[in-house]
């Protein structure tokens, strides 16, 4: 683990990291999040019967769009030419609820962790928004980086 925060200057001021001299490499990040809900809410979403429409399809697109706008949402994030973004949403009947997995990929000079995390977060928020009329007690949890590959800092995988 790195001991220094890369976005802070000598006086503690926030700065955008200069990545100009870094090598371009293929970088991938996978993030996940969960939306817990009542079993009946999950059943309604999976059946495609939510009043607002296709919850899963809309959340998937929202996550993809959010990843592309990460640099506009998070200060000091570099704009990236993303080569792939995918958002997968699967039922988890044990929660009960939905598991969101977002993958972001780029060939560039900086990582895509924030893009994957933003995609997962916004997909979860969209699920909540589209189903809140029937279940305001839904819980968004477990947003985290699961895996990253590429770049100077090396690879990372949860539990490894």
Swiss-Prot record:
Domain of life according to the entry: Bacteria
Pathway(s) the chain acts in: Cofactor biosynthesis; molybdopterin biosynthesis
GO molecular function: cyclic pyranopterin monophosphate synthase activity
Alphabetized InterPro entries for the sequence: MoaC (IPR023045), MoaC_bact/euk (IPR047594), MoaC_sf (IPR036522), MoCo_biosynth_MoaA/MoaC (IPR050105), Mopterin_CF_biosynth-C_dom (IPR002820)
EC number, as in UniProt: 4.6.1.17
BP GO terms, sorted: Mo-molybdopterin cofactor biosynthetic process
Positions bound to substrate: 76-78, 114-115
Gene3D superfamilies found in the cross-reference section: Molybdopterin cofactor biosynthesis C (MoaC) domain
Name under which the protein is recorded: Cyclic pyranopterin monophosphate synthase
Species this chain originates from: Mesorhizobium japonicum (strain LMG 29417 / CECT 9101 / MAFF 303099) (Mesorhizobium loti (strain MAFF 303099))
């Amino acid at each position: 683990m790195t001991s220094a925060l890369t976005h802070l200057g000598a006086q503690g001021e926030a700065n955008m990291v200069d990545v100009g001299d870094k090598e371009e490499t293929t970088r991938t990040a996978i993030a996940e999040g969960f939306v817990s809900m009542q079993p009946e809410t999950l059943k309604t979403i999976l059946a495609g019967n939510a009043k607002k429409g296709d919850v899963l399809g809309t959340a998937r697109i929202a996550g993809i769009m959010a990843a592309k706008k990460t640099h506009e949402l998070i200060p000091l994030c570099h704009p990236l030419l993303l080569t792939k973004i995918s958002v997968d949403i699967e039922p988890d009947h044990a929660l009960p609820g939905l598991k969101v997995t977002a993958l972001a990929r780029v060939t560039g000079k900086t990582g895509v962790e924030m893009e994957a995390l933003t995609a997962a977060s916004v997909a979860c928020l969209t699920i909540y928004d589209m189903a809140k009329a029937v279940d305001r007690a839904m819980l968004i949890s477990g947003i985290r980086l699961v895996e990253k590959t590429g770049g100077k800092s090396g690879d990372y995988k949860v539990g490894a």
